[in-house]
């Protein structure tokens, strides 16, 4: 069964042109990432049918929703999709339950995978069903908006910076629920964001946009580890590793294992065997040619240099490393690179000074 998403759009405006040609996975979270004005929201609106591209094609598996070459265009209200915007836009005269029931009325396909009580439980809003929207926090309103979208039985969920209007506390409140959706839903999610932390935590696939064009598209780490794109991530350059809790040690440390080896973090509460996603910034990795020695840095792994490239920061370079098949980035000074004679193929040790757990 074909589940791939095909999206080709050209949208011309007086001061901006969107011109994209994408093939995206039919499952998991695809993040559309870029700076303000890069075309992320325009691309998402074109996918939804809210922005009709003069030259456009959009297919979800074998279902073609738009093909301008044949004059074919299914309007947004007839598409089996859910859309969540920055603002929740709940109906103020309806309770949480009433807003969710509105989603049921919008179904364009047969059955909803989850019932209203199941969705409410999944998103942690079961205790809020009788409340009016004005008695909800920003994070709670967004969860209700997501629930309403899911009850319409969508075949794809489009999310336009759903956390942008929330403060840090509310963002941290809602992120675990988005992760739960990721694991529970069989439908693809297209997620627009300009926040690297959100992308690193949630995405499986990453599309990098700039000035209306696709700069890069691929599996998350494949794009994150590209050293020809340092300007896109700047100080946030780094990689994501998928690790597993291996052991809780007696000195309040937890050992995580990943294909490239093991890393230690402060003691975690998750049981052994639990998968954890971690982020390692390039700025938190230093390099040494010396063998493993006494050091306060616990996490030190053997690596080989793949390539290096200059960064936007004068006097610095970005080094791509291979750690038993896993990519790792290090940002060091040009002077250090010259002193250590950093070059492709060089074997060395990478010292990881900090690991950010994305959970």
Curated annotation (Swiss-Prot):
Residues 1-236 form the ABC transporter domain. Its main location: membrane. It is a peripheral membrane protein. Residues 294-359 form the Mop domain. Keywords: ATP-binding, Cell inner membrane, Cell membrane, Membrane, Molybdenum, Nucleotide-binding, Translocase, Transport. Signal peptide: none annotated. It comes from the Bacteria. It catalyses: molybdate(out) + ATP + H2O = molybdate(in) + ADP + phosphate + H(+). It is an enzyme of class 7 (translocase). One of its GO terms (molecular function) is ATP hydrolysis activity. ATP binds at residues 34-41. The keyword Secreted does not apply. InterPro entries: AAA+_ATPase, ABC_transporter-like_ATP-bd, ABC_transporter-like_CS, Mo/tungstate-bd_C_term_dom, ModC_ABC_ATP-bd, Molybdenum_import_ModC, Mop_domain, P-loop_NTPase. Its EC number is 7.3.2.5. It is found in: Cell inner membrane. SUPFAM superfamilies: MOP-like, P-loop containing nucleoside triphosphate hydrolases. GO terms for cellular component: plasma membrane. The complex is composed of two ATP-binding proteins (ModC), two transmembrane proteins (ModB) and a solute-binding protein (ModA). Part of the ABC transporter complex ModABC involved in molybdenum import. Responsible for energy coupling to the transport system. Belongs to the ABC transporter superfamily. Molybdate importer (TC 3.A.1.8) family. This is Molybdenum import ATP-binding protein ModC. It comes from Dechloromonas aromatica (strain RCB). The gene is modC.
């Amino acid at each position: 069964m074909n589940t791939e998403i095909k999206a080709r759009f050209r949208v011309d405006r007086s001061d901006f042109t969107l011109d994209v040609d994408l093939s995206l996975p039919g499952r998991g979270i695809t993040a559309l990432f870029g700076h303000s004005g890069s075309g992320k929201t325009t691309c998402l609106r074109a996918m939804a049918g809210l922005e009709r591209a003069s030259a456009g094609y959009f297919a979800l598996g074998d279902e073609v929703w738009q093909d301008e070459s044949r004059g074919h265009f299914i309007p947004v209200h007839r598409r089996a999709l859910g859309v969540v915007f920055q603002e929740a836009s709940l109906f103020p005269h309806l309770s949480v339950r009433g807003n969710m029931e509105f989603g049921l009325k919008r179904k364009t396909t047969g059955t909803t995978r989850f019932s209203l009580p199941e969705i409410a439980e999944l998103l942690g809003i079961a205790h809020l069903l009788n409340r009016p929207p004005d008695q909800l926090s920003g994070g709670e309103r967004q969860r209700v908006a997501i629930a309403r979208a899911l009850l319409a039985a969508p075949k794809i969920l489009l999310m336009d910076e759903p956390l942008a209007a929330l403060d840090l506390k509310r963002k941290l409140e809602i992120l675990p629920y988005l992760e739960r959706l990721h694991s529970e839903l069989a439908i693809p999610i297209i997620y627009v964001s300009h926040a690297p932390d959100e992308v690193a935590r949630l995405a499986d696939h990453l599309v990098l946009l700039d000035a209306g064009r696709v700069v890069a598209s691929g599996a998350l780490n494949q794009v994150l580890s590209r050293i020809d794109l340092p300007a896109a991530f700047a100080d946030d350059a780094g990689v994501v590793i998928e690790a597993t809790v291996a052991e809780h040690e007696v000195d309040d440390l937890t050992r995580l294992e990943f294909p490239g080896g093991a890393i230690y973090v402060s003691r975690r509460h998750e049981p052994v065997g639990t998968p954890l996603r971690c982020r390692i910034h390039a700025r938190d990795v230093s390099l040494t040619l010396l063998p493993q020695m006494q050091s306060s840095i616990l996490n030190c792994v053997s690596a080989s240099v793949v390539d290096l490239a200059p960064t936007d920061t004068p006097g610095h370079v970005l080094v791509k490393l291979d750690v038993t098949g896993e990519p790792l980035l290090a940002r060091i000074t040009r002077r250090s690179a010259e002193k250590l004679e950093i070059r492709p193929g060089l074997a060395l040790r990478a010292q990881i000074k900090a690991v950010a757990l994305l959970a």
